[in-house]
Amino acid sequence: MSLSGASERSVPATKIEITVSCRNLLDLDTFSKSDPMVVLHTQSRASQEWREFGRTEVIDNTLNPDFVRKFVLDYFFEEKQNLRFDVYNVDSKANISKPKDFLGQAFLALGEVIGGQGSRVERPLTGVPGKKCGTILLTAEELSNCRDIATMQLCANKLDKKDFFGKSDPFLVFYRSNEDGTFTICHKTEVVKNTLNPVWQPFSIPVRALCNGDYDRTVKIDVYDWDRDGSHDFIGEFTTSYRELSKAQNQFTVYEVLNPRKKCKKKKYTNSGTVTLLSFSVDSEFTFVDYIKGGTQLNFTVAIDFTASNGNPLQPTSLHYMSPYQLSAYAMALKAVGEIIQDYDSDKLFPAYGFGAKLPPEGRISHQFPLNNNDEDPNCAGIEGVLESYFQSLRTVQLYGPTYFAPVINQVARAAAKISDGSQYYVLLIITDGVISDMTQTKEAIVSASSLPMSIIIVGVGPAMFEAMEELDGDDVRVSSRGRYAERDIVQFVPFRDYVDRSGNQVLSMARLAKDVLAEIPEQLLSYMRTRDIQPRPPPPVSPNPTPAPEQP
């Protein structure tokens, strides 16, 4: 039995408040200054269409507005959240449809604002030919209630007996209600075996996952009897809210567990037991945004598989084939992940390596060669620079083998080992088509790297079976080597074919891939910081919005 039709939505993002100012705007009014307003548009991931999200207030007679009305956006690290800020001069009728009222616009991603120094960026306004349109200043602030963590403990009494030869094996499932009336699963307790009076272990959950910041939003809790075959028996349910749960900080709260079917069929039905909230507390913890705002940089490194199993790059059947019409799976994976991570790296310089190729002129086999052919400086300028070096390498090296991961993992680990203050966190993207040839050495490298500020993303391309890669992704069983277990789960593996859009929409394919492979990075960074007791540094001092010269009346 599936658990009560929970939807497949992501856990709610943290909420980011954007403050907007402008400087040196165009002056369109004849007898006074412009009356500016900013309109924010967000871009749909699926259709790429721009939709209006909100507007600031209008500030009269100024070219240097500091707007009071803010924009509050859900923030997902793993998504490219494109924003467009349009600035208008608004007349008394609030009419902004005329082209002459347009003062300029700026395009950028939400990640660029958060990744800016002190989560603050300044961008030039463009869009009016032949005119300097001034600048827009954007500041991102995480809403305070997004960092709250609720810890609670529950027990039950006299639950219905569901097992024929014994008592029930009860567990709880928590659901957050959505605005459209559906429910999203947000937590499952452990199973307590063979009892009708279970006491569950205390657990913690982000408040935003429980209610998305709405303290009165319905929280539904289902009670199930666990069955080995997965067809868990429904015992009953009850509803509450974050606000009601929080009252347990001062008193026990008892809920009746009701089974709607039994209630309809049996006149004398009272309930299927009770659940008691024994304790409830709320604490704040540091978030991913805290570390980014404090200056932590994400250092992105790429490693690409140049083994012969990819096929001749000159042939359309090759996974490396450079079609003039569309990107290869390798290029799509690189672009999808890199274009998001680059917003959190101030210098935009990315080391990029290949492995499994014979290098000219002597034909030496290398498992860690710089794509830009520069052993002293393997950095490429931006993701476009990485792609350019990758395409150039395909023209000069000979695809060969075998497939070794350990050398490039150890290379990045050596750099990460030099950082212990939380100022940098390394993300290695490995893109490969086949079976790994150095599994023992790779496991050893991963176990060693698990104690460092480092995460590894592996994307499998092509039709191969990737069972060995699943073994490296420690979601279910922690990776081990020589009896030593990885300190943290730092590997995320996905097969690219699972994300290819059937209609051939490459933008959508890349967005889906990035969403899955990057979703774990914030928590992996936080787990490293917590185990090392590293607190985020205070945001660097940022000069206040530049004060313009006094405007002449």
UniProtKB/Swiss-Prot annotation:
InterPro entries: C2_dom, C2_domain_sf, C2B_Copine, Copine, Copine_C, VWF_A, vWFA_dom_sf. Belongs to the copine family. Its cofactor is Ca(2+). Keywords: Calcium, Differentiation, Metal-binding, Repeat. One of its GO terms (molecular function) is metal ion binding. Residues 531-553 are annotated as: Disordered. It comes from the Eukaryota. Pfam families: C2, Copine. This is Copine-9. SUPFAM superfamilies: C2 domain (Calcium/lipid-binding domain, CaLB), vWA-like. Ca(2+) 1 binds at residues 163, 169, 225, 227. Residues 536-553 have a biased composition (Pro residues). Ca(2+) 2 binds at residues 163, 225, 227, 233. Residues 299-500 form the VWFA domain. Signal peptide: none annotated. PROSITE patterns: C2 (PS50004), VWFA (PS50234). Probable calcium-dependent phospholipid-binding protein that may play a role in calcium-mediated intracellular processes. Plays a role in dendrite formation by melanocytes. Residues 1-125, 132-255 form the C2 domain. GO terms for biological process: cell differentiation.
